From Swiss-Prot:
The active site is at Y129. GO terms for molecular function: 3'-5'-RNA exonuclease activity; nucleic acid binding. Pfam families: RNase_T (PF00929). This is Oligoribonuclease. One of its GO terms (cellular component) is cytoplasm. Coiled coil: none annotated. Its EC number is 3.1.15.-. The keyword Cytoplasm applies. Keywords: Cytoplasm, Exonuclease, Hydrolase, Nuclease. It comes from the Bacteria. Its main location: cytoplasm. It comes from Buchnera aphidicola subsp. Acyrthosiphon pisum (strain APS). InterPro entries: Exonuclease_RNaseT/DNA_pol3, Oligoribonuclease, RNaseH-like_sf, RNaseH_sf. GO terms for biological process: DNA metabolic process.
Length: 184
């Protein structure tokens, strides 16, 4: 284990919906990659306890997905609130990356950042202000080379750790098949 300012922090949140003023975080996971997108550490996967009233505001899609994958049951039994989950996550990150150095990495992570700003401001502050958003590259591929999208199929787990692992794989796919950087 070595702190490296070039390591990348990947994050995924599962939420009860998309509006941070109404909805809440129900799961968080992080992992660390090196600059070549090799996973070097996986952080804690933490279901976050939420009161029943916060669970009840979920729309039908979220209820179905999170009941089917067992997340709602894990949330109901969790001993972690947002602050404790934030603290545990930061303790993990401090082992691998200095504060405010790594961009926030993942899929549609601007959405995650909105929730971090609302409910986990210390964690939000841990990241650099930049992003590496795999969704942006996917949108560019859709517009500039749509046939490439047929070659990568997502599993849509809607579980935080599985989703960020898949985001790393997806970015590797785009790196090799769409961005095609020349080796030095």
């Amino acid at each position: 284990m070595k702190i490296n300012k070039k390591n990348l922090i990947w994050i995924d949140l599962e939420m009860t919906g998309l509006n941070p003023k109404v909805h809440r975080i129900i799961e968080i996971a992080t992992l660390i990659t090196d600059t070549n997108l090799n996973i070097i550490a996986e952080g804690p996967v933490i279901p976050i306890y939420q009161k029943k009233e916060h669970i009840l505001v979920m729309d039908e899609w979220n209820k179905r997905i999170h009941e089917n994958n067992g997340l709602i049951k894990r949330v109901e039994k969790s001993l972690y609130n947002e602050q404790k989950a934030e603290h545990e996550t930061i303790l993990f990150l401090k082992k691998w990356v200095p504060i405010q150095v790594s961009p926030m990495c993942g899929n549609s992570i601007a959405q995650d950042r909105r929730f971090l700003f609302q409910y986990m401001p210390h964690l939000e502050n841990y990241f650099h202000y930049r992003y590496i958003d795999v969704s942006t590259i996917k949108e560019l591929a859709y517009r500039w080379n749509p046939s490439i999208l047929d070659k990568f199929k997502k599993n849509h787990y809607h579980k935080a750790l599985e989703d960020i692992r898949e985001s790393v794989v997806e970015l590797n796919f785009y790196k090799k098949n769409f961005l095609k950087f020349k080796k030095k």
